[in-house]
Structures are given as structure tokens and as C-alpha cells.
Amino acid sequence: MTASDPSVLSKPATGDTSFVVVIPARYQSSRLPGKVLADIDGKPMIQWVVEKAQLSGARQVIVATDNDEVAAVVNSFGAEVCKTRADHQSGTERLAEVMEKYQFSDDEIIVNVQGDEPFIPPDNIAQVANNLANQQQSSHVARMSTLAINIDSVDEAFNPNAVKVILDKDGYALYFSRATIPYDRERFLNSDATTEENIRAIGDFYLRHVGIYAYRAGFIKDYVNWPTSELEQVEALEQLRVLYQGERIHVAVANSHVPVEGVDTPEDLAKARAYATSLV
């Protein structure tokens, strides 16, 4: 990490909220196998993620993986590893096994940071934990919190790998989708619908979900006992299980700019490597 990286704080983020970061790190990936170990400017991707998490103010950072090679690499740079089973269907299910092994109290705030987010700002990790803690004082209590960023490009708005989220007036998720939501009928039915000008005219309606979650350990136990919903299966989005159960998810616009979003494809990895080498 270098001081010129805008996603890095010079010192750990501060705040009154106590939380634990768990980073699910699965080796297998249909679009980019072994991506968590992919080299980015001399370091494996998972090390970038761990170092960001360590700057967030978390009291503990744990990498959860079912893969021996990933575990060995994480151990090699001195981070904490929890070996998990290989049959989990989602990162949240992997977290549930970590909760069981570590016997965290039901009130412990757990932040799920994806293992393919090498440039996630530490400030955003602290933000999502604080947002969940503040739900205790809210009249609309959500047991899960996440973040989003504004979309201002045509490619991103219509990219199924960029998950969109729409919110109600109080900042709670109405729906997450890989589709372009909301769909502006008047603009998009026109031949010039997908111009930059038209996308920007939507204003702040277009939000891209950032794959980071905060929840209490007790909520994770509830989550894994709920059946998988059809919406979750169709969209391949684990957070839809929560909405299907009638639970709220609090969504806030991230405090800090995310310079490079999650690495899902070889093209994403190339962007991440280019960004890392651009840092002075």
C-alpha cells in the first residue's frame, strides 16, 4: 500500500463501534478461478483486502476459506485464517460456520468484506459497521446494512455484473438486481436512450451495490436457517433472501470513492493491476 492510494487511510479509521471483519475467500470462481490469489503489483489480491480491513478499526480480521493454498498464503503474511467446509453456497453461509467456531455473541457486529475487493476503502468498512450500530436508534430497524455508489456511465448501468439497488425514501433497499433498474420507459424506448446524457439525467436513482455487509452474529444464524428464495436463485444474489423474508436492509452511499470495484473477470483484474501500478 502507498500513501497516494486514495482508498488507504494514513491511520486506522476511528469510531465507537466495535466490530469484526470476516473475509470469505473462495478459490473456485466460474469467471476467474483462483482470483483471490491473483498477483496485483507483487501481492496476492487477498493480502490487499486484508490490509484494507486492518486499517478499518476492526478489533479482529479473519479470512474464511475452504482452500489449503489460500490458507497457506494468508498465513504467510501473518493474517488470521479460519478453515471452513467446501459446501457453502454463499459467503454468508461461510460466515455462519465462522460464527459457530469462534462462538461470537449474538450482538457482535460482523462485517463481511468480499475477498475480491482489493481497493475497498477502510473508511467504508467502518461506515457500514457504524450504520448498523445506529439502527438501534432508528424507528425502522434493519438487521443488515450495506453500501452503494452512484452510477454515471452507460456501460455500468447496463452491465449485469454491476448489481443495481433501488431504495425507499428512508434509505432501505426495495430490490437488488442485475437488470437496469429503475427502467426509464420514456428514455430507454428512444433510439438514443443509452447516451451518457440520458443516464446522468436519471440523477441519483442509479446506484451500484457495493458488496460489503454488516450484521450481528445472531442475524447470520437466522439467515442460514431460511430457505433459499427463487429470487435469490434467479438473480444469484444472496441478499435477496433477506428481502424475501420481509427483513430490511439499510443502504447508504459510500463515504469514500471506490477506485476499482470487485474483481470478477479477467478484464476487472487487468483494471486492478493497472490501478495498482499507477500508484506512486
UniProtKB/Swiss-Prot annotation:
Keyword tags: Cytoplasm, Lipopolysaccharide biosynthesis, Nucleotidyltransferase, Transferase
Known EC number: 2.7.7.38
Pathway terms, separated by semicolons: Nucleotide-sugar biosynthesis; CMP-3-deoxy-D-manno-octulosonate biosynthesis; CMP-3-deoxy-D-manno-octulosonate from 3-deoxy-D-manno-octulosonate and CTP: step 1/1; Bacterial outer membrane biogenesis; lipopolysaccharide biosynthesis
Subcellular location: Cytoplasm
Pfam family, one: CTP_transf_3
GO biological process terms on file: CMP-keto-3-deoxy-D-manno-octulosonic acid biosynthetic process; lipopolysaccharide biosynthetic process
EC supergroup of this enzyme: transferase
Top-rank taxon: Bacteria
CDD domains: CMP-KDO-Synthetase
Family stated for the protein in its record: Belongs to the KdsB family.
Alphabetical list of PANTHER family matching this protein: 3-DEOXY-MANNO-OCTULOSONATE CYTIDYLYLTRANSFERASE (PTHR42866), 3-DEOXY-MANNO-OCTULOSONATE CYTIDYLYLTRANSFERASE, MITOCHONDRIAL (PTHR42866:SF2)
UniProt protein name: 3-deoxy-manno-octulosonate cytidylyltransferase
Lineage of origin: Bacteria, Pseudomonadati, Pseudomonadota, Gammaproteobacteria, Alteromonadales
